[in-house]
Amino acid sequence: MAFGHRALHYVQHTLCYLPEPFGVALRAPARSRALRGCALQKKRGLALGLALCIAHCALCIDKEPVDYVNPLMGTMSSYELSAGNTYPAVAMPWGMNAWTPQTGKMGDGWTYTYTAHHLRGLKLTHQPSPWINDYGQLSIMPITGQPRFDQDERASWFSHKAEDARPYYYSVYLADHDVTAEVTPTERAAMMRFSFPQAAGHYVVIDPFDKGSQVTIDREQRRVTGYSTRNSGGVPEGFKLWFVIEFDQPLAYCATVSDCSIVPSCMEATASHAGAIVGFADNTRLVHARIAASFISPEQALLNLQELGSRTFDQVMSAGRDRWNDVLGRIEAQDDDRDHLRTFYSCLYRALLFPRSFYEIDPQGQVVHYSPYDGQVHEGYLFTDTGFWDTFRSLFPLLNLVYPDQSQKMLAGLANAYRESGFLPEWASPGHRDCMVGNNSAAVVADAIVNGIPVSDDDAATLWQALTHGAHAVHPTVRSTGRLGWQYYDSLGYVPCDVGINESAARTLEYAYDDWCIAQVGRTLGLPTSQWAAYERSAQNYRKLFDPTTRLMRGRKANGEWQTPFNPLKWGGDFTEGNAWHYTWSVFHDPQGLIELMGGNEAFCAMLDSVFALPPAFDASYYGGTVIHEIREMQIMGMGNYAHGNQPIQHMIYLYDYAGQPRKAQYWVHEVMRRLYQATPDGYCGDEDNGQTSAWYVFSALGFYPVCPGSGEYAIGSPLLRDVTLHLPGGRRVCIQASGDGPYVHSLTIDDQPHRSNFLTHRQLRTGCTLYYRLTPEPHAD
C-alpha cells in the first residue's frame, strides 16, 4: 500500500474517535455518495487558510459501515462477569476460519481478554463461546533473540494503544520482541505480515497445540504443514484441522518441537504437543506468511491457499474491507449520534460471524464439507458454531429478513446435518454438543420456511422428517439434542419436575412453542392437516404449568401436584439460567392466551411492570450457592429483576404491545439500548452469544422485533436511528425514518398511510416500503 493510501486509510479508520467539529459528517457510506466540499472559516492569512482547508476536507470523508465497528466490544469479560464474552474476530462474514490475538493460555476459553497485558500469538480459532471452547486451533507468534516455544516464554507485553482491531485486519506491536504483527483473512486463508527490528534473531513460532499434533518443514519450498487435533467435543474419531503456511523469505533456521523439546534441524515431528520454529536472516526486516486450513485434507488446505491468489497483503486487506462494507451495508444507517452508529454496526458485525461456514470448495469447484457428525466428506453446505437456544430468537430472523441468500444455504446445511447424524443440531460446535435445553431447531426452520426462504423439495421433506423425529426422540449420547423427557411430555403434556430431568419447566415451555413451530412448517409446506394438527394442539401445553395463584409458570410433579416450596426468584431448578419471573413469558406463540390466563391486559401489564419493580433478589441454591455470572449481571444492571444479559427474557419488553400498552415497550426498549449497550470493551450486559444479543439491538434500533419467530410478524418498538435503508434482494428497499425527540411513537405511517397496529408483517417488509416514525418525549395515549 502506498504511503498516501495508507495515510488516507488510517484517517478514515480513526475519524470516528475525533470530537466534533473535527469528526466526519455522519452520512451514507462513501460508495453511495460523492465526497462533499468543505467550507473554510474566515482566513487569517493564505497559509493558515490553506492548512485549514486541507485538514477539514480530509476529515469530511464519508465513513463506511466497517469504520464504525469495534471488534473489541465485549472483550472485557471474565468467568465471574461477562461484558459479552467475545474476542476480536478477524474474519470474513460467516467465514470458516477466524483469527484473534491470544492472551489466554492454551485451552483457556477466554482466549482474549481486554484487561490482559501479554500476547501469546495470533490464533486461528473456531470458538463460538468460552463455555463451549475451541477446536481447529493454531497459534503463530513472531519472536526475536533466541528460539523459544513455551507459551509463557514467547509471550510479549502489548498495549491497546499499539493495537488496531478491525473486522478484516488486526495489528499489534509486540514490545518484548520489537515486532509488529499483522493479519488479514479470507474465508479459509489469511496473510500475515511481520515487521522485524534490526536486532539479530528473527523467528516465527508455529504452535498447533497439544492433545495430538504434527508438523513438517519443507525448507526448499519455505513451507510448514501439519495438523491440530485439539478440540472440546463434538467431533468424530480422526478429526483434524490441516494447515499449510508458506513464507516469502528463505528459512535460515528450522526446528521442530516435540512435547516442549526444541530439536534444531529436525524437519518433522508428531507428538502430543508438536510445533515448529522457523527463522530468517538477520537482515530480514519484513516477512509475509500465507496460511490456509482445511478440515478435509492437507491437499484441500493447499487448495484453500489459492483464495489468496497472487495478491499482496494490502490487496487482501482491501478486499476484506470491501466485503465487510458490502455485507454491513445491506443496512445503511445514518444518525446524528456517532455512538449510535458505532454500537449499531459493532452489533451487526457480531451478528454476521455465526453460524460459521463449515464447507469448502473442491478442485472441481463443488461445495463439499467434512462432516463433524460422521467423519466423512459430503457434498453440499454445512454451518456450525451456534446454539439455537440463544439464536432462534432474533439472529436467524435477522438473517432471514436481510440476508436470505445466506439463510438459504443454512437451511440446506441443516438438512445435511440431519442426514449425517439422524438429528438436527441444537448446539453445534462443530458437531452435536450437550448444552442448553429445548428443541429450538424447529423455530429456526419455521422462521425460514414461513418467511419464504427457498428450499428444495428434497430438503423440505428431509427437514419435515427431522422435525417430527426430533420431537419424539432424544440423541443417544447428547441429551440436549432432540427432546429429553419427550415420553413424559407426550403423555402428560409437560415434563415433570420429579423424574430426574432438570430444568423441566423450561423444557416444557420450549417444547410447546417448538410444537407450534412444527405445525407452522407443516401448514406452510402444504402438508395434510392430519400431519401437523396434533402439534398445534400440543402447543397449548404451556397452560399446564401456569399457576393461577401466583400468575407464574411453575414446576409440576408427575402426579399433577405443584413443586413445593416455590420461590419465584430461584434460578435454575425448574428453569434454565433464569427464574419463574423470566420464564413465564416464554409463550412466544400465544401471548393472548397468556394474557387471558393472567386476567386481562391490565393484570398482564402489571406483571410485566413487576419484573422491573422487583429488587434484583435471587436464590442461587441450585448452583450450590455459586452466583453464576448471569445472576450477577442481572443484579448490577439497575433494572430490577429484568435480566437482559441472558436470552429467555429478551423478548419480554415487546409483550406490552400485545396488551395495549406499547408506550411501555417503547420506553424500556430505549432504556435497554441506552444503558446496556455501548461500542466499548465492556459494551454488553452479559454473554453476546453468537449474534443473539447483538441482533436484539439491531432489530430494536430499527424499530421492530420478532417476538415469535415463525409467525411472520414483528412487534413495533421505537427506532433509535434517524434514517435507515434495508437493501433487500431484487433491489427492494425498506426505508425507516424517524423524527422528533424521545422514545415514544406519536405516529407511524407506512408508505404515507397511517399505521395503527402494534405489529408489522414480514410480507410488508420484504416487498419494500417506507416507515416514518414521529417520536415525542411524552407518551401518546395507547
Model-derived features: positions:
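Sec-dependent N-terminal signal peptides
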Residues: L46-L50
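N-terminal polybasic/positive-inside topogenic patches
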Residues: G4-C16, A28-G45
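Accessory carbohydrate-recognition regions in carbohydrate-active enzymes
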Residues: I61-F396, N400-A443, I449-L509, C517, ...
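Surface-exposed interfaces of beta-sheet-rich extracellular modules
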Residues: A738-D752
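Surface-exposed, charge/polar-rich loops and edge strands
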Residues: V24
